[in-house]
């Protein structure tokens, strides 16, 4: 394989990746869809009004559960990223012009879908002086203004570590301030060549220093060891991270990083317990967990553990019960 599906010549790393066949998934990664009335209503609304969510467009396997709980994720800044991470299937290249009306459009989508909690994530926009910080901040403000009873979680790139850019997002006061570390120091540059491990930790620390509830994610199965995961968890907690999600890497296609291992549900349970012992206030770990999975539930859990009262206008966001994709729930189903 020397040509990418879109017709361009493969990068050397892509050609090397393509030499490794796509891996067969283990039995525990099979997902059973359960469509409830809330999901059916949201799906009908989204189709009827031409609304776009990452949940549908990325084919997320957890869409049924999240939509049933009136939670969804939106991607802003366009569909092209200025950086290439070896696990991510978002297109890399020169992005188009910023749509200054996008914050309003996203806020209207949140309103039309009747969401209780919205996660907003952004492509990296290194072509912009502020890295897209204004767009992220304005989207938070627009959602809150139009949907006062909706919680907002913002998942940002690192804005090249520019404190002023990060501060713009913090000042918009999202319920959760998130930046994903994704992997461990030893393989970080191989997996995320345009990012820096310490810089990512610094972004999280800035959020914590300004009173944010801070969240991050680690993807397992890209070449790390369990000991390295534990060390990264300690680094994240030391940086001020309150909430952590642990996920299994699923290879999007042959030109992406090969899967190094399938992490068993039992290992996710052990790592989840380790994260709680380290001091994380909210932990979600499992093979099919994704960073925005049951995000509102994790926020509510962290708020209660911090001793913060959940505001009246967000009191409908609950942290009770288990989540289907948590490793412990998965093991219970597997028997």
From Swiss-Prot:
EC number from the UniProt entry? 2.8.1.8
Where, by residue number, does [4Fe-4S] cluster 1 bind? 55, 60, 66, 292
Query: Which Gene3D superfamilies would you find in this protein's record?
Result: Aldolase class I
Keywords assigned: 4Fe-4S, Cytoplasm, Iron, Iron-sulfur, Metal-binding, S-adenosyl-L-methionine, Transferase
Give the binding site residues for [4Fe-4S] cluster 2.
81, 85, 88
Q: Which domain of life does the UniProt lineage start with? A: Bacteria
Task: Please report the name of this protein according to its UniProt entry.
Answer: Lipoyl synthase
The source organism is Kocuria rhizophila (strain ATCC 9341 / DSM 348 / NBRC 103217 / DC2201)
